[in-house]
């Protein structure tokens, strides 16, 4: 669940930054002058390009963001018996799955938790919590690692990025349709876009983004079942 929350938070943040940046440089005005605010086919194309772009930026930042947000201490050189064992387990499972050995790390959390993230199966990170290390046996920890390695081997983060990109496109599209309606119909603005449009777009984008995240989380839950199966193999 942690990897999904990191991805969704990063994704929404990037969409907001892109939206604000485009507004500041007057990009929306350029679209309007070319009729894109009224041409729904063109608006959908614009939404798809920026929606997929935001999602894949999130994907490529996912490992870095996870390290920062969770405070992951990356293990480059094992310093104790557990870390040596941890690395050996990941190396062995990587060989079985025929993937590049992921970065490994531990983050501070009282509860037993773990996640996998990264831009591809050959550029990934596996992290486990200090609570998991303290409260589980090595056999149990190895099963958890197997679950996360299954996510990596199945390319779940890339597939998730594709789904998130499509969801983003609809969020961008409908937030601008709502903004256009508020600006033209409710606020009766007939000369360019007013401040009401920009605030409406940003607000709608946040709300729709949160609602749409349920689709992503549903998909993630299905992949969790698949990873459970893969981890047990």
Walk through the language-model features, giving the residues of each.
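Polar-ligand-bearing catalytic/cofactor-coordination segments
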Residues: 1-19, 23, 28-37, 43-199, ...
């Amino acid at each position: 669940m942690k990897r999904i929350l990191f991805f969704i938070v990063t994704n929404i943040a990037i969409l907001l930054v892109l939206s604000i940046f485009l507004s500041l440089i007057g990009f929306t005005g350029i679209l309007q002058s070319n009729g894109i605010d009224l041409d729904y086919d063109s608006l959908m194309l614009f939404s798809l390009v920026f929606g997929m772009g935001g999602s894949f930026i999130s994907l490529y930042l996912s490992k870095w963001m996870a390290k920062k947000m969770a405070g992951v201490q990356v293990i480059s050189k094992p310093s104790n018996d557990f870390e040596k064992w941890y690395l050996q387990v990941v190396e062995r499972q990587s060989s079985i799955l025929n993937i590049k050995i992921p970065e490994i790390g531990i983050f501070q959390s009282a509860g037993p938790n773990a996640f996998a993230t990264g831009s591809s199966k050959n550029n990934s990170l596996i992290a486990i919590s200090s609570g998991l290390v303290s409260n589980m046996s090595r056999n149990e920890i190895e099963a958890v690692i197997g679950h996360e390695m299954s996510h990596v081997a199945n390319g779940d983060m890339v597939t998730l990025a594709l789904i998130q990109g499509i969801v983003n496109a609809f969020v961008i599209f409908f937030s601008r349709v709502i903004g256009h309606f508020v600006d033209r119909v409710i606020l009766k603005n007939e000369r360019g876009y007013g401040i009401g449009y920009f605030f409406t777009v940003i607000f709608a984008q946040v709300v729709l983004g949160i609602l749409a995240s349920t689709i992503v989380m549903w998909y993630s839950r299905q992949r969790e079942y698949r990873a459970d199966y893969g981890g047990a193999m």
